[in-house]
Amino acid sequence: MSKEEQYQKLCEINRVEGFDPAAFAVEYTDMNTGEVRKRLPVMIQMAWFRLKYPEGRIAVEVTPAKDCFVAKARVYPSYKDGLECYLAEATASRGPDPAHPSVSPREWAQTAAVGVALRNAGFGLQFGA
């Protein structure tokens, strides 16, 4: 199998007939490197996940820490799956941002953890866009 054929196979991960996630890609600037990249908004990732796994579950736990909140998200293909039977897991921490005082650090941490967990489960633009 050629490299191009293998790439096409990778692009079929979590394929849903009639849905093209690349159409929803937005540009953002990486906070660490300043590099402009493309990503999917978390709401689109969640919608894609629901299309692929209608009975799926996204579990989030948030813990307050010193000057921030730490969120852990796990993605399950079925709401019936046991705690350790998840597709992917991610954590994120966020504190107050003086430049955006109206942004809740708790919600920001939750959203970041969910987005990374979904990306780790294959609901992202890791293979193109």
Features from the language model and the residues they span:
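N-terminal, Lys/Arg- and Ser/Thr-rich interaction peptides
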Residues: 1-43
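Positively charged, aromatic-enriched nucleic acid-contacting surfaces
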Residues: 46-129
